[in-house]
Regions:
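Membrane-proximal periplasmic segments of bacterial cell-envelope enzymes
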Residues: 1-314, 350, 354-360, 700, ...
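Beta-lactam-recognizing serine transpeptidase/beta-lactamase-like catalytic domain environment
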Residues: 72, 78, 299-316, 325, ...
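Solvent-exposed, polar/charged alpha-helical surfaces in well-ordered, non-transmembrane soluble domains
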Residues: 93-101, 209, 213, 238-242, ...
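Amphipathic, well-packed alpha-helical segments that form the structural scaffold of globular domains
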Residues: 286, 290-293, 303-304, 334-342, ...
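Structural motif corresponding to the C-terminal cap of alpha-helices
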Residues: 336-348, 427, 600
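Intrinsically disordered, low-complexity mixed-charge segments
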Residues: 678-719
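Long, low-complexity, intrinsically disordered segments
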Residues: 718-768
Length: 768
């Protein structure tokens, strides 16, 4: 190699070394940059995670009685829940098949609101929505709409759409229906990475154990502890308590008349699969009973591995709603009502009371309008509502009807004290005013209603007229007052208008001159509680309390207070609220009290000799049906308060087909006895002893009774003495069953002026 060639090699080597040095320098600098300057950024990328938040449902608040005993509570239950986040790449339909088979093996059901039945032999489907059910038809329309189908779409069209959307073509028809229904339910619950799907609810412990045992091979299938509404005594005021239920599609998605869609419940923090109060106090106090949901956060890495879970927000239970009702007293009144109806059936089982099988009682405190008891007969058991709904809704005795608040009845002679108050206060009569009674009212030439003259005749004053329920006296006073005047007083006393209770109640009505069938004679009929006037038992009790309070009417109410569930602290309390006042001139209310105090002496039975003075007024209004030509069935009505001179409680009673109002006298005494036992503390002990004895008897019967027989007949109450003879449609219309299973008000027929009730030989000191 010559010198020139050597120089060339050296230069090339130097170039290579320089180039290599530059590359090494760049590499070193890059390493320094990665390790020191931007290490945090790359470390974050290497450990990239995503947080997913899931709702943890808060426990619903309890409903307790005035003594703090639980009536409605949340008990622990278990749901089968699917987490899309945790399922990963699992075959969803294969997993669903496996879960369904497991649930079926344990006798469980899963959530499926698709209104389509199993395919027939030809492979065609049919809708299961009831044609006469408004809720079913709304749900059916919503289902078609959510699937993008026209309203004329058939069940086959719906299934074809589901099979296509969820690629179920390879499955047999049965499994297409099962999986299609579950997918539809998932769609309704918005199943996603951030929203789990509740597949089955309140499953058994055996099912819980089986799923947990298979957890490794069933990723994303979880058992979630939740709460279920339960009732310690399911037959205590079920109509008033109401119930909870699932959020319906119509309530979740609301479309107004302009086509605008909103999600009001979602905006309030609800999830589609939440339970919500749908009727009664459960619905009215939803905001108080519903707790504040918690949040559980699940952290997942970029490669799908769950790296952490944390309860980021602890759920807070709902508040406790405390009622004015004492459960022991309520049960005592329930039993007393059933006993009274059974007595009428066994003793007076023909004529005007041949079909006595239903009734209601309301007892309220005269001091503040708080409801102490609200009884319906027949009734039902809250704990059996879901499983026995079909039986309850078809029962001719209408156990779902809240007669105490929504039953409307002609008041009969219980209305007479209102007319007396109006006449005395307006100056039409005074203590010494009299009306001559000879048994026939002769003011009109072409209309001469009668009086049965049970124990009076001649010149009758207001006290005697109330005592003996003299129709002639009230015909004449009512005619002179006119319905405009005595109606105004009746309204202020609490009749024909809302009492103010927190839950749904019927308004009723009074007879007015604007009525289409109004005549002058209707004024005199309405003055004795006939005509078009209809009121509810809770209005009768409120009215009796207002008479007892000398014209001061309080708002009637069921809720005593709202309590903090954890501490018991009173958060809010219902204060006595005066709704109306009749000042009452002179001795108006005292004269009415004197007349009502003498009524018990005209009634056979325990009430006539009861040691505590009772002020009462019976009523025997006619029903439209007759049991013989010219002979009408009769209801038995009663208003009472006691002790008469220092009132503590007021009572309103209605017994359908009860025959005569006087037949409720023993019922008033039984209620009074229970009340005084409540006051001295013995009632709770007695109730507990009776409960233990009843449980022991049931255990004995369970050992000897055929299970099939034991499963039959769940209606609370004697269904009844003669269920086949119950025909409420004649005067008390059978309710159209609401979507939520809550009966609507029963309203009596409007009646033309009728001849006065004739004396019946089977009556206990009969009166009108």
């Amino acid at each position: 190699m010559n010198q020139d060639e050597h120089k060339i090699v050296v230069r090339r080597m130097a170039g290579l070394i320089a180039a290599a040095s530059v590359l090494i320098a760049v590499y070193v600098l890059r390493l320094i940059f990665l390790q020191l300057v931007n290490s945090d950024s790359f470390k974050s990328q290497a450990t990239n995670t995503t947080d997913y938040n899931f709702t943890v449902t808060a426990a619903r608040g309890d409903i307790v009685d005035s003594a703090g005993r639980r009536i409605a509570a949340s008990t622990t239950s278990y749901n089968v829940v699917l987490s899309k986040l945790l399922m990963g790449d699992e075959d969803l339909d294969a997993m669903l098949q496996r879960i369904v088979e497991l649930l079926e093996a344990h006798g469980e059901k899963w959530n499926d609101s698709l209104l389509i039945g199993e395919p027939d032999a030809a492979g065609h489907y049919s809708f299961t929505a009831q044609a006469d059910s408004t809720s079913d038809q709304k749900a059916l329309a919503a289902m078609k709409d959510s699937l993008g189908l026209q309203q004329y779409a058939t069940a086959d069209d719906v299934m074809e759409k589901l099979v296509e959307d969820y690629k179920l073509e390879s499955y047999p028809l049965h499994w297409q229906r099962v999986l299609g229904g579950i997918h539809y339910e998932m769609q309704q619950q918005a199943f996603s990475n951030v929203n789990n799907f509740v597949m089955a609810e309140n499953v058994s412990e055996v099912t819980v154990a089986t799923i947990k045992e298979n957890s490794l091979t069933m990723p994303g299938v979880e058992i979630v502890e939740t709460s279920t509404r339960s009732y310690d005594e399911g037959d205590i005021i079920p109509h008033v308590l109401g119930r909870v239920g699932k959020i319906t599609a119509e309530k979740w998605k609301v479309t107004d008349e302009n086509g605008q869609t909103t999600y009001p419940l979602r905006e309030k923090g609800y999830n589609m699969n939440d339970m919500i109060g749908v009727s009664g106090l459960e619905a009215v106090y939803e905001d108080e009973l519903r707790g504040k949901d918690g949040v559980e956060t699940i952290t997942r890495s970029s490669d799908g591995v769950i790296v952490g879970t944390a309860m980021t927000t602890v759920p807070e239970p709902g508040h406790t709603v405390q009622l004015t009702i004492d459960s022991a007293f309520q049960q005592a009144v329930d039993k007393a009502l059933a006993k009274n109806i059974e007595m009428i059936n066994s003793t007076y089982n023909s004529g005007s009371s041949a079909k006595a099988a239903a009734g209601a009682v309301v007892v309220i405190s005269t001091k503040d309008g708080s409801v102490l008891a609200a009884s319906n007969y027949p009734s039902y058991d809250q704990n059996l509502f879901a499983t026995q709904y079909s039986q309850y809704s078809s029962d001719p005795g209408l156990p779902l009807l809240n007669r105490a608040l929504q039953g409307l009845y002609t008041p009969g002679s219980t209305f007479k004290p209102a007319v007396a108050v109006a006449a005395l206060d307006s100056g039409i009569i005074n203590r010494f005013s009299t009306v001559y009674c000879n048994g026939v009212y002769t003011y009109y030439d072409d209309y001469r209603p009668k009086c049965t003259r049970h124990g009076h005749s001649g010149n009758i004053d207001v006290v005697t007229a109330i005592k003996w329920s003299c129709n002639i006296f009230f015909y004449d006073v009512g005619r002179r007052l006119t319905s405009d005047v005595y109606d105004a007083y009746a309204y202020k006393l609490g009749l024909g208008q809302r009492t103010g209770v927190e839950v749904s109640e019927a308004v009723g009505r009074l007879t007015t001159k604007s009525d289409s069938n109004y005549t002058a004679s209707l004024d005199v009929q309405a003055a004795i509680g006939q005509g078009n006037t209809v009121v509810s038992p809770i209005q009768l009790a409120t009215y009796a309390a207002t008479l007892a309070n000398n014209g001061t009417r309080y708002r009637t109410h069921f809720v005593k207070a709202i309590l903090d569930t954890n501490t018991g602290e009173v958060l809010s309390e219902t204060k006595p609220e005066v709704m109306d006042v009749i000042e009452g001139t002179g001795n108006t209310f005292e004269l009415v009290r004197q007349g009502m105090k003498q009524v018990p002496s005209t009634i056979s039975g325990k009430i006539s000799s009861y040691p505590v003075p009772i002020a009462c007024k019976t009523g025997t209004p006619q029903r439209s049906e007759t049991y013989a030509p010219g002979k009408h069935y009769l209801n038995a009505m009663m208003v009472a308060y006691l002790p008469a001179d220092d009132p503590q409680i007021a009572i309103g009673i209605s017994i359908e087909y009860g025959g005569y109002g006087a037949r409720t006298g023993d019922l008033v005494v039984d209620i009074a006895n229970a009340y005084f036992a409540l006051k001295d503390g013995s009632l709770a002990q007695q109730a507990e002893a009776e409960k233990e004895a009843e449980q022991a008897q049931q255990e004995d019967q369970a050992q000897t009774t055929d299970p099939a027989q034991a499963a039959a007949g769940q209606t609370t109450g004697n269904a009844a003495a003669q269920p086949a003879q119950m025909t409420p449609a004649a005067d008390t219309a059978a309710p159209e069953t609401a979507a939520e299973g809550e009966a609507q008000p029963a309203v009596q027929d409007e009646q033309q002026p009728a001849a006065d009730t004739e004396q019946n030989p089977d009556a206990i000191a009969p009166e009108n």
